[in-house]
Amino acid sequence: MATDSGVADEAVTLRLPASLPVGDLPRVALASLLRIHRIDPTDVGDLAVSVQDMAVEMNESGSDVVVDYRVYGSEVAVELRGDGRTLRISAPRS
């Protein structure tokens, strides 16, 4: 949930070491966060697939991957860091 300042009240961070395969963890973590905030997964479209694909790509390059999940009043945002890159993927909440 967002405060009036637009800053997320809560952030969840998932750290995935390069030495282990990513598996479904990024997608499952997002699904859990959506459930906690009572957000219908269909409201954020293909966000879960995009997060999963990018995390796997970064991990397969031999990099640790850090995934930050944030829920705002108007969007769900995910930031991925790894492989020397930082990517932000978001979807509006309907």
Question: Over which residues does each language-model region extend?
Answer:
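Helix-loop-beta hinge of the Bergerat
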Residues: V7-P41
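Residues in flexible loops and secondary-structure boundaries
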Residues: V22-D24, V28, L47, A77, ...
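Conserved ATP-binding N-box helix of the HATPase_c
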Residues: P41-V66
